[in-house]
């Protein structure tokens, strides 16, 4: 990676390797980790070597310059956890990279916008829609709104101002994204404080990998931890109906909007924890949130799960064992390994993929497809 801060900024921990070297290091590490479960070839989804992140956050650093003038810089940590001032980042998308110096100049030249600013968040899309969140240690007044609106117009971006107990949305709080997945366009609105996959190119390939390895079914899909519908919406093309659950209110709001954007009517989204949903499926207790949904109308043959780093709990692992097909996307190989110890008692691994979402870091994501063992 051609970066002025490579090997200094602590964001890229595998700085001593080329892209292929760091990828091979992670591949071999994970093959060894999962060798007790399978010896099949892993599918490998590579990242671009640079400019792959459509989401980024930087601190703002102030210092005195010539004539005692306050100078603003973006900042990260170095490997000793000291402040490292930066003026660019090669991990972020070209659009964010291009915007960074323009934005800091505009902020620098206006005390109303720069005073007590301590962080900036960027959320971009492949459609060049851009949302910038400015985070302050001060109350934001009407004068700030007027100044920020000028920057919105000049830089063709959307701005949100945040401070303690304040969230000022100047235009709207989401960006529009179009993903071409298996030669079909899908439309998404990504919210400022919602979860999105930061590496758009790898995200598309992750979804395509799932679709390519999922047969068309006349039955239904159950999804846990659906987020904003990133996988749900494309996967709905493979099933009669989809029932998807998510605990986050923000994510459910996004999922419903995204479903509407794609004119899909075969998905029902429920704001409910995975644990409560299992109780509902097993008829342990009734839930008001399911009053308009008859679970007996569903004939599930596949479960899709994309859990947080903590992985599955005992309840969801036991639920998954009842399905013919399990699709498991994991952001933590340690908890995936733990979960597979149970899931492989009833299912066999058919496909295994590694997704290099975060190049030059130790992190790698995984995808596993399992089929029920025949009696």
UniProtKB/Swiss-Prot annotation:
InterPro entries: MeTrfase_TrmA_AS, SAM-dependent_MTases_sf, TrmA_MeTrfase, U5_MeTrfase_fam
Pfam family, one: tRNA_U5-meth_tr
Example of a GO cellular component annotation carried by this entry: cytosol
Active site residues per record: 331 (nucleophile), 365 (proton acceptor)
EC number: 2.1.1.-, 2.1.1.35
EC main group: transferase
Residues where S-adenosyl-L-methionine binds: 197, 225, 230, 246, 306
Catalytic activity: uridine(54) in tRNA + S-adenosyl-L-methionine = 5-methyluridine(54) in tRNA + S-adenosyl-L-homocysteine + H(+); uridine(341) in tmRNA + S-adenosyl-L-methionine = 5-methyluridine(341) in tmRNA + S-adenosyl-L-homocysteine + H(+)
Molecular-function annotations in GO: rRNA binding; tRNA (uracil(54)-C5)-methyltransferase activity, S-adenosyl methionine-dependent; tRNA binding
Keyword vocabulary terms for this entry: Methyltransferase, S-adenosyl-L-methionine, Transferase, tRNA processing
Gene Ontology BP term (one): methylation
HAMAP family: RNA_methyltr_TrmA (MF_01011)
Role description: Dual-specificity methyltransferase that catalyzes the formation of 5-methyluridine at position 54 (m5U54) in all tRNAs, and that of position 341 (m5U341) in tmRNA (transfer-mRNA).
Protein family according to the UniProt entry: Belongs to the class I-like SAM-binding methyltransferase superfamily. RNA M5U methyltransferase family. TrmA subfamily.
Name of the molecule in the record: tRNA/tmRNA (uracil-C(5))-methyltransferase
């Amino acid at each position: 990676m051609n970066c002025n801060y490579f090997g200094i900024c602590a964001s890229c921990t595998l700085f001593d390797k080329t892209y292929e070297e760091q990828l091979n290091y992670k591949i071999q590490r994970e093959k060894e980790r999962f060798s007790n479960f399978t010896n099949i070839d892993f599918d490998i989804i590579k990242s671009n070597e640079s400019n792959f992140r459509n989401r980024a956050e930087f601190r703002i650093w102030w210092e005195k310059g010539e004539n005692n003038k306050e100078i603003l810089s973006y900042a990260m940590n170095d490997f000793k956890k000291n402040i490292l001032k930066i003026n660019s980042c090669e991990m972020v998308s070209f659009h964010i990279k291009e915007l960074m110096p323009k934005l800091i100049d505009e902020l620098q030249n206006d005390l109303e916008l720069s005073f007590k600013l301590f962080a900036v968040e960027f959320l971009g899309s492949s459609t060049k829609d851009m949302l910038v969140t400015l985070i302050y240690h001060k109350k934001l007044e009407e004068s700030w709104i007027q100044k920020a609106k000028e920057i919105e117009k000049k830089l063709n971006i959307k701005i949100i101002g945040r401070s303690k107990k304040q969230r000022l949305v100047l235009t709207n709080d989401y960006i529009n994204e179009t993903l071409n997945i298996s030669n079909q366009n899908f439309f998404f609105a990504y919210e400022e404080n919602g979860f999105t996959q930061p590496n758009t190119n790898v995200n598309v390939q992750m979804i395509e990998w799932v679709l390519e390895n999922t047969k068309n079914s006349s039955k239904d899909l159950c999804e846990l931890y659906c987020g904003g519908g990133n996988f749900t919406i494309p996967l709905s093309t493979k099933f009669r109906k989809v029932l998807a659950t998510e605990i986050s209110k923000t994510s459910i709001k996004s999922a419903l909007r995204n479903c509407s954007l794609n004119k899909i009517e075969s998905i029902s989204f429920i704001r409910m924890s995975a644990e409560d949903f299992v109780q509902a499926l097993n008829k342990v207790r009734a839930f008001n949130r399911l009053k308009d949904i008859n679970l007996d109308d569903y004939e599930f043959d596949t479960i899709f799960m994309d859990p947080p780093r903590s992985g599955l709990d005992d309840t969801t692992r036991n639920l998954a064992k009842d399905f013919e097909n399990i699709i498991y996307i994991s952001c933590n190989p340690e908890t995936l390994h733990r979960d597979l110890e149970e899931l492989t008692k009833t299912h066999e691994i058919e496909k295994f993929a590694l997704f290099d979402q975060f190049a030059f870091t130790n992190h790698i994501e995984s995808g596993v497809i399992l089929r029920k063992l025949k009696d």
